[in-house]
Amino acid sequence: MAGLVLSGCAIKPFSQSLPIPTKRFITNPSNINLLHPKDPIFSPNFHGFSRWAVKVSAPLRIPSIDQQDLDLDLERERISSLDVQEEEIFDAGAPPPFKLADIRAAIPKRCWVKDPWRSMSYVVRDVAIVLGLAAAAAHLNNWLVWPLYWAAQGTMFWALFVLGHDCGHGSFSNNAKLNSVVGHLLHSSILVPYHGWRISHRTHHQNHGHVENDESWHPLTEKTFKSLDWITRTLRFTLPFPMLAYPFYLWNRSPGKSGSHFDPSSDLFVPAEQKDVITSTICWTTMLALLFGLNFVVGPVQMLKLYGIPYLINVMWLDFVTYLHHHGHEDKLPWYRGKEWSYLRGGLTTIDRDYGWINNIHHDIGTHVIHHLFPQIPHYHLIEATEAAKPVLGKYYREPKKSSPIPFHLLGELVRSLKKDHYVSDTGDVLYYQTDDKLSKEK
């Protein structure tokens, strides 16, 4: 303690001759003369106790309970920071500690029930809205109304696609014939070859997250990326061109793949599926002929306004949504090949998105992780199934950012991904997107 009472102003320590008190507290005033006024700690001007000055300064620092508490708080913060660092180094590409069966077991049985009447009610609702919008726009025929019509009708075309998509998965009903009839009517009306797309989409689900075997929006390898001519490379990663890719995909598939959704001999299909592909191509051609005939009834300009522009809006919705469910630069989604790929790990590379008011309109397709793992679940059960599965998925589930009524925030996600997510390595089994610096600077 001697060092603690040394003065910073050269004051001497307590005299060694001072008696050591035997009592902790002085209760009798008469005992106060225990200390003589000539002792070195008192001023020589001492006259009684009315005027005296202690020549020992206060210690520079006295450990206190408050200081100890502060030290404990700092230690807790250090430990907490270590925990945060552990969270930050979570490896989304590592094999998950759960199995597909664990997720399935967590989902309530009612989520697997398909109600054809409920499914059909959505078809009736959407078709009625489509016809009502077209009738209203044709009647008003006002240039202030047309842009609103295009946005609304294009979104409804996209909603029809999602219902046809459910038919293709068999989540619409347990009746294969009903699924096929409704699927053809819905998809043909928006110029999609139902069976051709259904089969290729099945391939997409069976190989999701696989660099080479995935069917749609799969990453380009570095070799393929660098083999593209400048125009193709720029168009693929520059808006709005990627958002208009779907019709070209139906005809020619993605870069690095060959075949067509309209060609029954394409390597997309096995021989047993060729009749189905022909049927869908005939339905698609019939719809195209009907649209061509309507040109002579209402005129080509009116057809462009009533159908052509909404069709393009629908295509943009389709490309926008499907791209963002499998891309997100900030989310660092892994891709696999070889022995590292599995159905479960591939499905966990998908990501949910919140579309605000559009969620209900396009039948909750934004709840995409559970849909990809279990495409048999009807769309009207996906939200409940997702909530039930979250405790099992843990960190492998990426909570979507909450959207405003219109999902404008997703435009930023799209732009960042197109600017940074260009290709993956030609080698390795767990891969992440890499950036072409030259292409990134051009954007």
Curated annotation (Swiss-Prot):
Residues 1-51 form a transit peptide. A motif (Histidine box-2) lies at residues 201-205. GO terms for biological process: unsaturated fatty acid biosynthetic process. It catalyses: a (7Z,10Z)-hexadecadienoyl-containing glycerolipid + 2 reduced [2Fe-2S]-[ferredoxin] + O2 + 2 H(+) = a (7Z,10Z,13Z)-hexadecatrienoyl-containing glycerolipid + 2 oxidized [2Fe-2S]-[ferredoxin] + 2 H2O; a (9Z,12Z)-octadecadienoyl-containing glycerolipid + 2 reduced [2Fe-2S]-[ferredoxin] + O2 + 2 H(+) = (9Z,12Z,15Z)-octadecatrienoyl-containing glycerolipid + 2 oxidized [2Fe-2S]-[ferredoxin] + 2 H2O. It is found in: Plastid, Chloroplast membrane. It is a multi-pass membrane protein. Its main location: plastid. Keywords: Chloroplast, Membrane, Oxidoreductase, Plastid, Transit peptide, Transmembrane, Transmembrane helix. This is sn-2 acyl-lipid omega-3 desaturase (ferredoxin), chloroplastic. It comes from Helianthus annuus. The lineage of its organism: Eukaryota, Viridiplantae, Streptophyta, Embryophyta, Tracheophyta. The gene is FAD7.
